């Protein structure tokens, strides 16, 4: 591992130890082989003056859960050093009381909670302290010969600490091991089955000691051939089965979950190992990952429903074996899975969660194989894993009410998403928690929606291959499909039947009806495996109340409505709801050009303004109004409604 330290950059912070701490923390955070997603912690000890002008020593320690790769000064918690030092001398301290004491010793109440290892940082007698969960090091510490290998690699350079649960007990143990020792003898600490600490009175030395100690571990693994001991193979694909996996995991979890499928050669290689079940189900590479991954993955095969159900039962038995009778069980759904021939799968309530889990899994499968190559991978004991997963601070979080967006974890596909009603629906579905894929013939769609959970796809809905590819991409990206909004359509120029050219008629029938049927047909297999799946067709007031000169449009939309009604009957037994909205006078859509408005007003013998407010409520209906109705119809409010036609038109007399 190479140091990313840059003298020229560091010089700009020479007189600001806290800003220098930010800089070196970010350097560590950018190395995925050192820390992942909120893991690790750093600190700096600084003398400052309080409100009374008195000098105080303050430990600025990384706030709990803050990401080192992006941390700023606001991500550090300022805690009075003397209080933290005295805490280490206590005989007993619950973790809950530890957190309270640490917060009471903070000099800024708006800062995040200090790291649970703040006491440990405080009692290391150096200005700068760095802590990581380096892959190379934990591959060696989590080994049947772990301590012997660490001594062989580091000799007397480091203090070796046996595994103890992070928090007060770990800080107390290290305090007892070192309070009569000369810290200058050590370049760092290796915490068995946990990670690495380095320290120094200047930031560069502490940082480069970390890189050096990790490099020694990497060199050892390289010499043993471990770094090359990573299986690889090509992936197969079964998107329908993927959607079934997601459905069953969501059922166990009790809410919709997103999926991130890793089909990389490394993921497929690991999943295909003959001994994968035994080596992958020992436990995490560091207890820090438990909050994201649970103790072990689910192993998937031919009968995914049974395998996921068995995993749930096994997790409940694990809880029953270890609980003291006063703990609240976590849900029993897996957070990742091993799918032989297909790769690894991460599950999460949001795309952010799935990315965190997937990244951890990517490193986990490497570290396990490295460990196997040097004598045998060995994780923590079941009891140690349980104690960490169910420690009191985690239990306290269960008592807090977490309000999730109503569509959190759902997957939605919308056509005609670049403007008007489609744009509004896509944005609002995303706001309400869904991962969304928007299709449009406008190439700018890829720029309009370019987030990880809000994807724009350039697609002509008359191109069946392109539509099929987009549907499959949706399932591949998020694991399934729950919401379908067929919105794309055209509004032909006004033509009376006797004057209508064949192309106008055929084009309207193709885009407004036939394409909708083909899209629905492609999506049905995935919708049947969806979570409370729902389809909402964006139809038109022209179905219940057609107007002269709009035969091509009205007939196609009427056909679309009949398609939706039949679909509601056919799919009801599979739990898929199909409803229709009939908007009218939504003038912020691409359909309503100035020319179209003028033409329609002429048909009714009125001005454009009179035409736009021609409803009982004398109000205009916006795309956002339609989107709000659509979101309600795919949500729990309409959970027991299917086959319904709901007008949203301000009260059209002819419809009423």
Tell me what each language-model feature is.
Residues 1-412, 424:
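Glycine-rich flexible loops
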Residues 491-494, 638, 642-656:
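Short C-terminal tail/terminal secondary-structure segment
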Residues 495-497, 501-506:
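Substrate-binding pocket helix/loop in short-chain dehydrogenase/reductase
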Residues 407-436:
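Canonical Rossmann dinucleotide-binding motif of NAD(H)/NADP(H)-dependent dehydrogenases/reductases
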Residues 572, 577, 641-643:
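Short, small/polar-rich loop/turn modules that mediate ligand/substrate recognition or access, typified
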Residues 525, 569-570, 639:
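Alpha-helical segment proximal to the catalytic Tyr-Lys
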Residues 536-559, 564-573, 584-587:
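Catalytic loop of short-chain dehydrogenase/reductase
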């Amino acid at each position: 591992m190479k140091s990313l330290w840059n003298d020229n950059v560091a010089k700009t912070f020479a007189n600001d130890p806290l800003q220098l701490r930010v800089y070196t923390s970010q350097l560590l955070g950018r190395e995925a082989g050192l820390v992942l997603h909120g893991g690790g912690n750093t600190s700096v000890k600084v003398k400052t003056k309080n409100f009374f002008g008195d000098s105080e020593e303050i430990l600025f320690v990384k706030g709990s859960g803050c990401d080192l790769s992006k941390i700023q000064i606001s991500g550090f918690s300022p805690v009075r050093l003397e209080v933290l030092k005295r805490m280490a001398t206590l005989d007993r301290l619950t973790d809950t009381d530890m957190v309270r004491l640490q917060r009471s010793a903070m000099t800024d109440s708006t800062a995040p909670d200090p790291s649970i290892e703040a006491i440990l940082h405080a009692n290391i007698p150096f200005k700068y302290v760095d802590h990581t969960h380096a892959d190379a090091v934990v591959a060696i510490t989590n080994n049947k010969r772990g301590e012997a290998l660490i001594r062989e690699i580091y000799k007397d350079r480091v203090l070796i600490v046996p595994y103890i649960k992070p928090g007060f007990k770990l800080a107390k143990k290290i305090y007892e091991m070192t309070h009569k020792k000369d810290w200058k003898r050590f370049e760092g600490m290796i915490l068995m089955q946990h990670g690495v600490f380095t320290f120094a009175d200047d930031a560069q030395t502490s940082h480069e000691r970390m890189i050096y100690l990790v490099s020694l571990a990497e060199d050892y693994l390289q010499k043993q051939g471990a770094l090359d001991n990573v299986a690889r193979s090509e992936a197969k694909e079964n998107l329908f089965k993927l959607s079934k996996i997601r459905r069953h995991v969501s059922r166990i979890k009790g809410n919709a979950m997103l999926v991130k499928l890793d089909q990389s050669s490394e993921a497929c290689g690991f999943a295909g190992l003959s001994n994968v079940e035994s080596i992958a189900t020992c436990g995490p590479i560091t207890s820090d990952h438990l909050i994201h991954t649970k103790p072990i993955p689910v192993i998937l095969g031919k009968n995914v429903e049974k395998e996921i159900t068995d995993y749930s039962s096994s997790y409940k038995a694990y809880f029953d074996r270890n609980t003291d009778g006063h703990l609240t069980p976590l849900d029993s759904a897996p957070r990742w899975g091993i799918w032989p021939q297909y790769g690894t799968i991460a599950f999460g309530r949001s795309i952010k969660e799935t990315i965190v889990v997937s990244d951890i899994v990517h490193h986990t499968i490497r570290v396990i194989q490295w460990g196997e190559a040097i004598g045998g991978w060995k994780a923590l004991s079941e009891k140690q894993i349980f104690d960490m997963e169910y420690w009191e601070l985690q239990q306290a979080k269960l008592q807090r009410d977490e309000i999730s967006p109503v569509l959190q974890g759902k997957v939605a596909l919308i056509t005609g998403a670049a403007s008007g009603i489609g744009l509004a629906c896509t944005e609002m579905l995303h706001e309400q928690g869904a991962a969304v894929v928007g299709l449009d013939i406008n190439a700018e769609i890829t720029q309009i929606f370019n987030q990880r959970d809000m994807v724009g796809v350039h697609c002509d809905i008359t191109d069946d291959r392109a539509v099929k590819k987009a549907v499959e991409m949706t399932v591949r990206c998020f694991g399934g499909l729950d919401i379908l909004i067929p919105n794309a359509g055209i509004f032909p120029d006004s033509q009376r039947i006797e004057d209508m050219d064949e192309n106008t008629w055929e084009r309207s029938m193709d885009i407004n009806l036939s394409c909708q049927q083909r899209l629905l047909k492609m999506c049905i297999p995935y919708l049947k495996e969806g979570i409370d799946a729902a389809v909402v067709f964006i139809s038109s007031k022209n179905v219940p109340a057609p107007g002269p000169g709009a035969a091509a449009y009205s007939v196609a939309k009427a056909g679309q409505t009949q398609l939706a009604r039949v679909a509601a009957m056919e799919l009801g037994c599979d739990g898929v709801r199909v409803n229709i909205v009939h908007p009218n006078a939504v003038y912020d859509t691409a359909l309503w050009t100035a020319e179209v408005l003028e033409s329609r007003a002429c048909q009714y013998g009125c001005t454009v303004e009179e035409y736009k407010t021609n409803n009982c409520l004398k109000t205009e209906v916006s795309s956002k109004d339609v989107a709000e109705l659509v979101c309600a119809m795919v949500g729990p409010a309409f959970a027991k409604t299917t086959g319904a036609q709901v007008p949203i038109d301000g009260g059209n007399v002819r419809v009423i």
